[in-house]
Amino acid sequence: MKKIEAIVRHFKVEEVKDALNAKGVQGMTVTDVRGFGRQKGHMETYRGTEYAVEFIPKSKIEVVVSDANAQTVVDAILSSARTGQVGDGKIFISDLQSAIRIRTGESDDSAV
């Protein structure tokens, strides 16, 4: 199994969700996060005072899939989240040792 974590722009979450649903992904977790990469930060003005925003708000999408479906899910995220601009985000792929569905006790691929 693979855990796929994607950091994407907020306005791309629905598009990514729809792309993943079309590929058969049945569940995901979405979290509001803040961070920076090459995009760094930006300047904003509030009540006439300019200040630096160092951490950019993004959304983190987490999906657990079988090894066989991992590349399909990554491709769906890439195609739906990309704008071509700095700050589109990142995808992280990790091996997942085990997963257990609490309600039934099913484990591993049966649990996802």
Residue positions per predicted region:
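Positively charged, small/polar-rich N-terminal and surface patches that mediate targeting and assembly
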Residues: 1-112
